[in-house]
A protein has these predicted regions:
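Conserved RNA-binding domains used in RNP assembly and mRNA/RNA metabolism
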Residues: 3-112
Length: 112
């Protein structure tokens, strides 16, 4: 049997990619508070951390507009985005949301 040595950083990255899907129990909107999400609306995409809900608005902190996600599987699994612009705080009309996907990566801090 052959053995391959990898750095701790590489091991953690592989372990995270091969690990079980995180179970997210969402029963009401407030369960999203504190979660990092990739949100697709009818016209654009954002990533950010849910801060609160006000009426029909979802407030994101550390939000970024995703102009081009690149290959979608890579964006979700690896956190790689082809074109992204950090914008800070953002409010989203929840009626415009098409889908929401957990974001397991650091939120973008640099324009790309």
């Amino acid at each position: 049997m052959k053995t391959i040595n990898v750095s701790e950083e590489t091991y953690e990255k592989i372990k995270n990619q091969l690990g079980e899907e995180e179970k997210v129990d969402i029963n009401e909107l407030k369960d999203f508070v504190g979660k990092k999400l990739f949100i697709r609306t009818v016209t654009y995409h954002l990533v950010g951390k849910v801060k609160k809900f006000t009426g029909n608005l979802l407030e994101l902190s550390d939000a970024s507009w995703v102009a081009d996600s690149g290959r979608f599987m890579n964006a979700i699994k690896e956190g790689t985005l082809d074109e992204v612009e950090p914008i800070g705080t953002a409010w989203i009309n929840m009626q415009s949301i098409v889908d929401i996907i957990p974001w397991k990566h650091d939120l973008p801090t640099e324009q790309k």
